[in-house]
Regions:
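Well-ordered alpha-helical segments within folded domains of soluble proteins
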Residues: 2, 52-68, 78, 114-130
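Well-ordered mid-protein domain cores that form the structural environment of catalytic cofactors
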Residues: 82, 86-126
């Protein structure tokens, strides 16, 4: 791939993600009342469902943690990651290394451990969040 084309594509997607995609989610997904993330919206931003699918909770945790780790040390992204992690640990874990599939908005289990995708996305999110806590003391000491 041509270097100039690659740079233009990176610039385009970075701008789109940081100026369009993330502001859409930042304004809507943090559930300040019950914890975790509200993730079911239509393209106009209207909530279509308030169920909390654990795979999406894990994915959102991953995105906020990844943005903090790789793009910018934005305090809001770190707070949003910790916010989702707290909800997941409190309500999403089913035991024996498994995660529930879907909860109601308050965190009550609607469907238990039916999907390995829930397990995967939560582990991916937790792993990325853990990199923050492993590297932060080192960064502060530098």
């Amino acid at each position: 791939m041509d270097i100039l084309l690659k740079e233009r594509l990176v610039s385009y997607y970075e701008k789109h993600i940081l100026e369009d995609v993330m502001p859409f989610w930042d304004r809507r997904c943090i559930d300040k009342e019950y914890g975790g993330y509200i993730t079911c919206f239509d393209r106009e931003g209207k909530m279509t469902d308030d169920k909390k699918y654990i795979w999406f909770q894990g994915r959102q945790l991953y995105i906020y943690s990844l943005l903090y780790n790789k793009v910018r040390k934005k305090k809001e992204w770190l707070e949003n990651a910790k916010h989702g992690f707290s909800f997941l640990v409190k309500y999403g874990y089913a035991g024996d290394g498994r995660w529930n599939y879907v909860l109601d908005r308050k965190g009550n289990v609607l469907e238990g451990t039916i999907s390995i995708f829930s397990d995967f996305h939560v582990l991916q999110g937790v792993a990325e969040l853990s990199l923050i806590h492993i590297s932060e003391p080192t960064r502060q000491a530098e």
